[in-house]
């Protein structure tokens, strides 16, 4: 390339604007009647605000996301701080317009800021990106996102300059609408894009001439229109994206919508979910292809399930990793555990944190494990408690076996080596080690280590008194 052509190429390049995202998360949420910040109420298995941040991070890097916090600021910061976003503290909550005043120093280096509601978790990255692109194409000072609601009551109405115009004349709040304006179904969603020079060149013109004596971001539309600045609107066809969470009923509705959307996503990826409306599957759950989820299953947290599994009804699985080809029978409860390929668990098994079930192993009905490793091909099929236990491969643990791991002060470990056969109703008092290939007789209480290939018995010798019962009956 010649110097001349290089120069022409450079001069024709349009530099992309520096874009920030500001997330409004300072409010209390009075209508929820809650002791907790509104944005920390959970939908889809995580705080509302966490959903909004995750979406924003698909559009700009976390360093360019500014979460404006106020009410219970430190709790909100602690809940979502690991996401790497920036925080701006609105110490005195004097409205949404005031929040942007407080964020002025943080946002000043940017060309454009997208303002998101911290209580609207269904907004998508695609819609945010379209809104930003529309704002740039229109060369607007302010762009707002709207939607058509069948029942727009309670929302501000968007008043356009004309029916076919993208330009906005005003945003009229519900209480100020005329009878004719109340029939307008196009509502202001609370999502905006601002040109930074226009925003901070005119934000000082906001007033508190309202019932709550606050600065409202919606008033920026009228301020900019008066200043002959261009204010436009983009309507999303997906009205559910802008739903907020001001009431408990709205939180419940959002949770249901997010979970059904998650089920649909998984089914599109090759998972079968029967009666998805009965299942609770959190946003971060991953499931492999050809796995079947039966009705009334809860999959929580960061649970990850492999391919070709079957999760039967009424299981509650939290932060657990499950391999391929695993069958989980009805009624199992699992927390922070790991199940290897081709294992069978349940029915009614309880896996507490730190449980590891090996490849092809069986954990049966009414078996509880905690900080326990069950080796490849081993079985504990009935009525058993295994705590702080390491079990090798090919072990059979008989019905009613208990590891006594707690002495009232400390926990102790039980080790059962490969190929051991533990008879029913055995009591293993930790710390204890059962050597490779040994047998433990049924009903034994084992308090000492057992060498490899041994038989251990720890019970009283059976005594039979013939005729004793007949004599006892004669005494009546």
Where are these regions (language model features)?
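Glycine-rich N-terminal loop/short-helix segment of MobA-like nucleotidyltransferase
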Residues: 19-43, 59-60, 80
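Catalytic metal- and UDP-sugar-binding loop of GT-A-like glycosyltransferases, i.e.
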Residues: 43, 116, 456
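Conserved alpha/beta core of the MobA/IspD/sugar-nucleotide pyrophosphorylase nucleotidyltransferase superfamily
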Residues: 17, 185-288
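Structural beta-sheet core signal
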Residues: 21-23, 67, 114-115, 142-145, ...
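Conserved core of the sugar-phosphate nucleotidyltransferase
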Residues: 74, 83, 123-211, 218, ...
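Acidic, glycine-rich loop-and-beta core segments that form the ion-binding/anion-interacting portion
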Residues: 281, 286-355, 359
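Conserved N-terminal catalytic core of the sugar/cofactor nucleotidyltransferase
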Residues: 2-20, 46-133, 137
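Glycine-rich hexapeptide-repeat left-handed beta-helix
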Residues: 6, 11, 327-476
